Amino acid sequence: MDFMSPKFSLTDVEYPAWCQDDEVPITMQEIREIFVELMDKFGFQKSSMENMYQHLMGQLDSRASRTGAQNALVSLHVSYIGGEHANYRKWYFAAQLDLDEEIGFQNMRLHGKARQRNVKMAKKRGVSIKEQIKQWNEKEQEFINNHPKITLTQEQLEDQTNLKSADYKWKLKMKKLTPENMIRQLALYLLCWGEANQVRFAPECLCFIFKCALDYDISTSSSEKTVKSPEYSYLNDVITPLYEFLRGQVYKKDAKGNWKRREKDHKNIIGYDDINQLFWYPEGFERIILNNGERLVDKPLEERYLYFKDVAWSKVFYKTYRETRSWKHCFTNFNRFWIIHFAPFWFFTTFNSPTLYTKNYIQLLNNQPTPQVRLSVIAFGGTIACLVQILATVFEWGFVPREWPGAQHLSSRMIGLLFCLAINLGPSVYVLGFFEWDVHSKSAYIVSIVQLIIAFLTTFFFAVRPLGGLFRPYLNKDKKHRRYISSQTFTASFPKLTGRSKWFSYGLWVFVYLAKYIESYFFLTLSLRDPIRVLSIMDLSRCQGEYLLGPILCKWQAKITLVLMLLSDLGLFFLDTYLWYIICNCIFSIVLSFSLGTSILTPWKNVYSRLPKRIYSKILATSEMDVKFKAKILISQVWNAIVISMYREHLLSIEHLQRLLFQQVDSLMGDTRTLKSPTFFVAQDDSTFKSMEFFPSNSEAKRRISFFAQSLATPISEPVPVDCMPTFTVLVPHYSEKILLGLKEIIREESPKSKITVLEYLKHLHPTEWECFVKDTKLLSMEKSFLKEAESSHDEDRLEIPDALYDPRSSPLSDHTESRKLPTEDDLIKEKINDLPFSYFGFNSSEPSYTLRTRIWASLRTQTLYRTLSGFMNYSKAIKLLYRIENPSLVSLYRGNNEALENDLENMASRKFRMVVAMQRYAKFNKDEVEATELLLRAYPNMFISYLLEELEQNESEKTYYSCLTNGYAEFDEESGLRKPIFKIRLSGNPILGDGKSDNQNHSIIFYRGEYIQVIDANQDNYLEECLKIRSVLSEFEELELNPTIPYIPGIEYEEEPPPIAIVGSREYIFSENIGVLGDIAAGKEQTFGTLFARTLAEIGGKLHYGHPDFLNGIFMTTRGGLSKAQRGLHLNEDIYAGMNAICRGGKIKHSDYYQCGKGRDLGFGSILNFTTKIGAGMGEQLLSREYYYLGTQLPMDRFLSFFYAHPGFHLNNLFISFSVQLFFVLLLNLGALNHEIIACFYDKDAPITNLETPVGCYNIQPALHWVSIFVLSIFIVFFIAFAPLLIQEVLEKGIWRAASRFLHHLLSMAPLFEVFVCQVYSNSLLMDLTFGGAKYISTGRGFAITRLDFFTLYSRFVNISIYSGFQVFFMLLFAIISMWQPALLWFWITVISMCFAPFIFNPHQFAFMDFFIDYKTFIHWLFSGNTKYQKESWANFVKSSRSRFTGYKSKTVDDISEDSGHDSKKARFWNVFFAELFLPFCVFLFNFTAFSFINAQTGVSDSTPTSAVFRLLLVTFLPIFLNSIVLFLLFWVSLFVVPGLSYCCKDAGAVIAFIAHTFSVLVYLLDFELMWFLQGWNFTRTLILLITCINMHLILFKVFTTIFLTREYKNNKAHLAWWNGKWYNTGMGWSIILQPIREYFVKIMESSYFAADFFLGHFLLFIQTPIILLPFIDYWHTMVLFWMNPRSIIAHKRILTRKQRALRSRIVSKYFSLYFVMLGVLLFMLIAPFFAGDFVSSPQELLEGTLFEGIFQPNNQNNNDTGPNAPSTILTTTPTLPTFRTVA
């Protein structure tokens, strides 16, 4: 590309604000010469130079347009280099570069090993560091003395963090800069940045490169000799070595020369942040060594740049923060969260549980503990707070390497914490250890009071103070050495809240915690008081126990139940905080909404009647108009443009358009024409107009106009003239998202399992818009046909007819209706027949122009890139419209030359707005994608496309990568079929090192223009009326009025500048709402998060950046690391890191409530949960990140809570819900077992505690059972609070009626089931990520979810996530209901149904009769396939991939097809797996076992012998495993010696062997279940607890074996196939073939058990659905509920099948219908038979009486009533005397 050609030269037209300024400080030509000179000197690429030249000129022009050229240059230099908020200046002082220039890093007293090396090198040079520092101090003092404007006190002189003198020197240096110098510095920085590639993610590293380059440039500028470097020198010498180091951390080359990912977790990867943080401290610079061992700091400043190519980067970098995959991060980062929950919970609970610490408590007396014991025990809460802080500090030691200079000093903090622990714990030792608990001591009482006060103070202090500045802020420490300025600057420069925001923040959290503590105390803690009392004193010594264990375990059953109850209550204590946060946040958001006027419930705003005036005052900048017009004329142009745009989008019919337009009508005098306003503005406030319809019912047009009017009633910044507005860019990342729907995609079913086409579904969703579209198309068709007829007959009269077609307000052919004959019936029928293609497809001709219209219509109503770009290109239309309206002299200037006028408008739009689509794959697009892209480029030629180009250079094996830019005006390359690049910038290598999106944004960011960037996803939309507000939105950055004073005058105390606005967020309208329950739920959540919560969070400083429609300050963000972060996995939710980075570095984030964009959301069950999984896993990665560490340990208390509950708190809350429910069910097992085996007392809640409980010897368990109802109510509220924000948002936005309607729709559509399931997915994805890692980008479906998914697909996708645990909950719930019936437990059936059946309930057409049985066939096939050849969709593959999470994969491959399944599982660390997958399941098993042992302990049965419950459990657990192992052992030899021979005649011999093994396992487990009944004496309750315990024992055994003993998996499935077919010889495994069969043997033993479980579970899920599929018309009702479709629409769209297809389906259904019901009958019989078996074998134990196995049976129907007359004599029946306390000093 020839940049010197006139075609690409920059002219005055392109940058008029700069070029036409009379006082321009430097001309464009001079600027260009500077760029060229720098390019030659440093070896920058020519293409990059041209790009950066245009970039700088665009920014200069943007600022000059509103402030003048001189001020524009200075302000830009201030923003990039020299200003108070410029990142370069901050870094320069933070990293002590000023001292490097004056004394040199090599002569400074550094820390750690850097100090030793400095001393050693100083000795070599023969200088003294001490002497050097002394000389510098003398020079510094001399400088201060010579400049009287520097006024420093003695304290400031000693304080080296005081930068007054350094600032003075800096300003002195800046003041000396000429405009040429400023441009040179800006140009050099931009050129360095423009080719920095991945180094752009390390802003301080880039600053260092720029600093070295600047020093070199300054030193060589004065020399007469011209310094030149070859092109690509900068890239090859400076950037590529750094890139190669970064790439080498994540990838390595395999034997074939391909780059493969390393199996390293984040803590072992030196990432972008680690590299960047090296450049924060002098100690980091000192580490930079060259290949010859010399240090870079020992080289002169002006020569350092030349040595970059010799730096040994691999020896320089190290980890500055360890992202260890551990829950410990949560303890350190959120220590205050734990303190404000653990300590108050302890205070509340211990105060209300005196029985736990009362010596010799007797219920008949209800004697109380001594006061000092009570106070001391309560005061232990302070000790808990200390322990939390100590643990947080210990864990911090592991995260932050001590060698990093920014690491906090933890030793002194630990000493302080140990002291706090001592003063909190010491009194308890004195009070509880030195005195008996029934002795009253005055001294101990005083000590306990003081201890309690100290505990409260300690808890409050630790709760409020950030961990990073616990006893004294570490950032202010060590002032004499400027040590921690970098940490302050880059991690803790949080913008302060002021005024309303500050009090809002304080108020919110005071209200939340006040309400929380009051509610928790009275509702949670007081309800626990009685259960604690009854369980803590319950004596279970009358249980017989177990043969092996005796009564040891059963005696403690009440205490075990109490511990579980306390833990469950603690879970609720955490949960209800989030509940109150939601409630208070909603209330505060309502208050904000009313104060801003954004609510529909603010009638005083006169939204519609004042709309014209508001358009005039808030949309138009009329103050500087050159010609004054009546306001009405200007308003009409804006309003008509808006409604006509809606008409063109087919949102309005011609009739509606006529009612909404401003129209010219004849005046009463008749000689002039006047402008008539539409009655619409008056109608909304006047009841007489209510009958008039201005919009179609429930139309998109009405919603848009309504929001537009509402938004203009809110406070909006006054717009500046168009030519003064800042330039901005819209950036749209695109990978493989749909660009434009193809014809086949919209008129054919998505798959054979869809029953409706996309077009039909769209017609159902948008009936009015389709009608308008069809009318429009018919008019166009008629017009073309008239033209054709006219051309063929040359009849001029006929040519007049189409003229009417061009006027949308006239009816077609209206003048000819009278002359035509009335149509006959045949004519009408013929006309209807001719109209059929229009109504069905939108066209009646296969011409591309017609089909394209239908494709575009459909694409504009789905989530396509075409919709996004057509929406956001409205900015261009809006700018042109506003410019033309506000500059009426333009029209007269061009005097009817519309083309010239249009060119002028186009130039203005191009100056102020640029659209960049980051089409990463553009060069690899297929034919359809290229065609769609070309269509876009022709429609919007000003749209730019950035993309990656790969070229294989001659004689080189490595590909060369280029970052390219093109647009619709670029030349067409006939060879590739693509546009030729305008810019082609070589990269160091493949830029996609991370998850993709961040890297794509990063390589494209160099092509942005202007000052601001709006980041958009490829599934959004925008509207003309919203684009008209762009000037007001950009003014939110508070940079429109630039300060004309030059900030570089030394000695002047400038006013403190407010923090820069980094991000301006905006609202989202989710256009995928109201199209089915799932789409509406997803839309509602996104809407509330993006609007309701964002409004409050922005006000209280808790809002971050969530991508989507936010506007970013281009200079602020690009000089601080870019738009997002990009380390693979760690930065999966990449956008939020930009927000955290901005907050940490002093940027402010705002929210604009008056501007909104459209946004699409996932619509199907699977795609929504894919998104949920991505977000949950991404949060797991965020918890490990250093940003969370900085925010969690340094934010003030109120800001910390805002950050926590808005981000990690939401996900941890889901985890707490999941854990609380699981813990509660384990409690129910133990409480149910207790209730089942004891004789309960008669309970009267109003009776005094001291009354004798009857019958004598009974157990008072009713308070504990009552507490269960309270727990269930709490969980119910916590679940349903998820609907509150959406409900409130709907009330505010659309009114009470619409809100109630939407909420009712959700309830009737079973939305609560979906909410429960989503909660489970969130918690599972978070837990799994922190256990196994492997978070990755999951592409979510953006199409309509109208396709039925197979049962096995849903089963395999969700069984590990929810269905397995759902069935465990089902069994536990069933046990709880039959052992301790409570009506409240019925709520949990919703949980069970959701966890087990939600995937099937929300599957389209799940209950279609024939499809259901065809599904059964595919499920059976899935179970038994994959054993003779590799099948991706098979149970064998599913179970292997599930296992690989624990084992990981071997790196060895044999080029087998089975290795292409995306195996990227890393082997998880043992200690990560230990907690989540071993310890927690073991705890569940342990508590299951306590319930199991107690229910078999024969409590209250006299003269009985303990049974062998443990042996019984071991028998039913190991018997099927043992039998399976024998069968597998025998089948192995059969497969080894028999199957290879049989395979020649019977290809499926291996499958037969697998079938035998798996079928045998199913039968064995079926018999094992019957054996459980038999051994438990046909008692269903006891059998159920044995089954539950057996399942958990299986789980823990298999997980332990898999984790500890199993080696890694091969990526191929050769070993699996060889096990069944015996062909081990061709597996390609080498010598490992010897031991592989042994490994496979143990794997197959476990797989046999897993197979049986999946077989039974799958069938159970299907059998439960049987009654539903037999209901008449169930498919229609189900579809109506899911998609909110009209029943008529459902019936109208039946899939048409051929006769052959119908016959095949019938055969399959008849065959598998029979199999299905046979299986159902067998399993039902095996389940029901044991209920009646007791009638035939009533006492199984008699069969083995007198033998060794006699105790293996559990007796049934025993008399366990040992109360009343049978009660032991040891039980108190009379009230004893009250013991008196002994009093001592």
UniProtKB/Swiss-Prot annotation:
Any Pfam family from its record, for instance, is Glucan_synthase
What is the E.C. number?
2.4.1.34
One term under GO cellular component:
endoplasmic reticulum
Identify the domain of life.
Eukaryota
Q: Which GO terms describe its molecular function?
A: 1,3-beta-D-glucan synthase activity
Q: Which reaction does it catalyse?
A: [(1->3)-beta-D-glucosyl](n) + UDP-alpha-D-glucose = [(1->3)-beta-D-glucosyl](n+1) + UDP + H(+)
- Kindly provide the PTM information from the record: N-glycosylated.
The record lists glycosylation at 844, 874, 955, 1002, 1170, 1360, 1579, 1761
| Localization, UniProt | Mitochondrion; Membrane
Native organism: Saccharomyces cerevisiae (strain ATCC 204508 / S288c)
* Biological classification of the source: Eukaryota, Fungi, Dikarya, Ascomycota, Saccharomycotina
Give the protein's recorded name: 1,3-beta-glucan synthase component FKS3
| Family the UniProt entry places it in | Belongs to the glycosyltransferase 48 family.
Query: Which residue ranges run through the membrane?
Result: 337-357, 375-395, 415-435, 444-464, 508-528, 547-567, 572-592, 712-732, 1215-1235, 1268-1288, 1303-1323, 1370-1390, 1394-1414, 1475-1495, 1514-1534, 1549-1569, 1585-1605, 1655-1675, 1713-1733
One BP term from GO: fungal-type cell wall polysaccharide biosynthetic process
Q: What does this protein do?
A: Required for spore wall assembly.
Membrane topology note: Multi-pass membrane protein
Q: Which InterPro entries match?
A: FKS1-like_dom1 (IPR026899), FKS1-like_dom2 (IPR056261), Glyco_trans_48_dom (IPR003440)
List keywords of the entry alphabetically. Cell wall biogenesis/degradation, Glycoprotein, Glycosyltransferase, Membrane, Mitochondrion, Sporulation, Transferase, Transmembrane, Transmembrane helix
Q: Where is this region: Disordered?
A: 791-824
Name the residue ranges with Basic and acidic residues bias. Answer: 791-801, 815-824
